[in-house]
């Protein structure tokens, strides 16, 4: 039948070409002659006839190619020399020693802080009448108060302030180390009206007494102090005051609400807002216990001041201290020289050795000390031969002032080192005088001269100075200063 396959014809055998084109999943791969298919033409498998997958064998690593690991003989010592081990031990011991010394120093500093705080908390408040009549150092008290009034009168006003004109801007004052509030009356009589006064001190009892003094002034209608420039005016409106127990040298003051409200700029270029004046009278020397404290103090000052604000204060005179220390050391050198020259002959003429039980003990070298019946300065340890304190921190001495200070530890403030350090915080020196120089320059001022009479520094009729030579010597232990924030 043309065009079709004969039904009786046997199936054709496949040639080689057809075998090569057979798909890879043919029955030859699974060991069966033919692969059954379903109606759709898909392959079907008999699971029982499938062979399991062959397990893959890993190739073995060649043996003997890598060198065997060299084992350390038990008990063998590391390849470190005895000198290295000794140096390591010495470094460890040195670290331990430094850690002990640091801990001891921290403990001593805390003890000193506690001593100072306890001392000022314990000083009784005797009242103005006692200070004017019964105090043995009433002349010194009056003189120092007049000096502080001079500094406040001269440097608390803004540069563009015009005396005698009311209604001008008021100033904001931060008093670090305010103590019992002894300067509240002086600020009430400041040439430029004070709007806000913030007093801080680490001694809690002193802060309580400052609050009491402020309440007393408030009850008197703001009267306090003895007047200053324009002292003939009536009593001004009493300024607002806040008091806080705070160590302004050992910790930041920016956590105090009123400080943040006024404005605190911690950056070097701040100064848009802040206080007009920061005052530190007879207290800043405590900051020079360590460099860390001195810098913290200056950070607080610079952060609290606005640009153009003033830092005023009074501190011990480092020039006087250096001179006294140098003179003491020169005397000690001369004394040792004389002892050495006379020592051999005096011992040979004794005629024999020391008696049984006696010891020839070397003479203990005296530390630097000076003063009079009113005040005394004593260094507990060795001082620099040339009187120059290097480094400028941590030079402790004990200070005594009759009726006021009982052997309290204080610290030298080397003036040039302080001035240079202040420049790092944009504080530029404007004025620096000893108390004697201040008296000589301001005693005849048309305002400050009469103020000295009202404050009983000199006699109103005769002009005689009502301060003894001993009190003047004690007063000249101090200097006043003023810095501007630039």
UniProtKB/Swiss-Prot annotation:
Keywords: Methyltransferase, mRNA capping, mRNA processing, Nucleus, RNA-binding, S-adenosyl-L-methionine, Transferase. SUPFAM superfamilies: S-adenosyl-L-methionine-dependent methyltransferases. GO terms for molecular function: mRNA 5'-cap (guanine-N7-)-methyltransferase activity; RNA binding. Responsible for methylating the 5'-cap structure of mRNAs. This is mRNA cap guanine-N(7) methyltransferase. MRNA binds at residues 144-145. Residues 9-28, 35-54, 82-92, 333-351 have a biased composition (Basic and acidic residues). InterPro entries: mRNA_G-N7_MeTrfase_dom (IPR004971), mRNA_G-N7_MeTrfase_euk (IPR016899), RG7MT1 (IPR039753), SAM-dependent_MTases_sf (IPR029063). Residues 135-486 form the mRNA cap 0 methyltransferase domain. It is found in: Nucleus. Gene3D superfamilies: Vaccinia Virus protein VP39. Residues 1-92, 333-365 are annotated as: Disordered. Residues 352-363 have a biased composition (Acidic residues). Pfam families: mRNA_G-N7_MeTrfase. Its EC number is 2.1.1.56.
């Amino acid at each position: 039948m043309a065009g079709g396959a004969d039904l009786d014809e046997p199936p054709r055998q496949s040639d080689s070409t057809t075998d090569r084109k057979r798909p890879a999943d043919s029955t030859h791969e699974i060991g069966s002659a033919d692969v059954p298919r379903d109606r759709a033409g898909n392959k079907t498998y008999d699971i029982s006839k499938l062979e399991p997958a062959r397990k893959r064998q890993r190739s073995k690593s060649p043996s003997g190619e890598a060198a065997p690991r060299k084992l350390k003989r038990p008990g063998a010592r590391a390849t470190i020399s005895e000198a290295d081990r000794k140096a390591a031990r010495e470094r460890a011991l040195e670290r331990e020693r430094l850690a002990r010394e640091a801990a001891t120093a921290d403990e001593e500093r805390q003890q000193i802080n506690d001593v100072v705080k306890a001392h000022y908390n314990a000083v009784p408040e005797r009242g103005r009448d006692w200070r004017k009549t019964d105090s043995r150092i009433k002349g010194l008290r009056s003189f120092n108060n007049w000096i502080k009034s001079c500094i406040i009168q001269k440097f608390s006003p803004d540069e563009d302030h015009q005396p005698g004109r009311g209604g001008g801007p008021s100033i904001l004052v931060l008093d670090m180390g305010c103590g019992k509030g002894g300067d509240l009356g002086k600020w009430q009589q400041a040439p430029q009206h004070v709007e806000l006064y913030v007093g801080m001190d680490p001694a809690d009892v002193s802060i309580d007494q400052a609050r009491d003094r402020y309440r007393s002034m408030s009850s008197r209608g703001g009267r306090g102090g003895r007047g200053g420039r324009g002292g003939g005016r009536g009593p001004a409106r009493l300024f607002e005051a806040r008091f806080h127990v705070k160590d302004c040298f050992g910790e930041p003051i920016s956590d105090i609400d009123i400080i943040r409200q006024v404005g605190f700029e911690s950056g070097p270029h701040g100064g848009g807002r802040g206080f007009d004046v920061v005052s530190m009278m007879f207290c800043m020397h405590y900051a020079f216990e360590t460099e860390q404290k001195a810098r913290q103090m200056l950070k607080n000052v610079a952060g609290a001041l606005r640009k153009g604000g003033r830092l005023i204060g009074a501190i011990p005179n480092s020039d006087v201290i250096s001179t006294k220390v140098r003179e003491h050391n020169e005397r000690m050198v001369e004394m040792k020289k004389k002892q050495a020259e006379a020592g051999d002959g005096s011992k040979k003429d004794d005629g024999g050795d020391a008696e049984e039980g006696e010891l020839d003990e070397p003479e203990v070298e005296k530390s630097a000390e000076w003063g009079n019946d009113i005040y005394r300065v004593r260094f507990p340890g060795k001082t620099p031969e040339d009187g120059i304190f290097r480094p400028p921190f941590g030079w402790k001495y004990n200070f005594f002032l009759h009726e006021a200070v009982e052997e309290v530890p204080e610290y030298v403030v080397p003036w040039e080192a302080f001035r240079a350090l202040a420049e790092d915080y944009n504080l530029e020196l404007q004025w620096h005088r000893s108390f004697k120089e201040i008296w000589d320059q301001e005693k005849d001022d048309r305002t400050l001269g009469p103020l000295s009479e009202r404050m009983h520094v000199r006699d109103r009729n005769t002009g005689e100075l009502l301060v003894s030579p001993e009190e003047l010597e004690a007063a000249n232990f101090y200097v006043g200063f003023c810095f501007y924030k630039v």
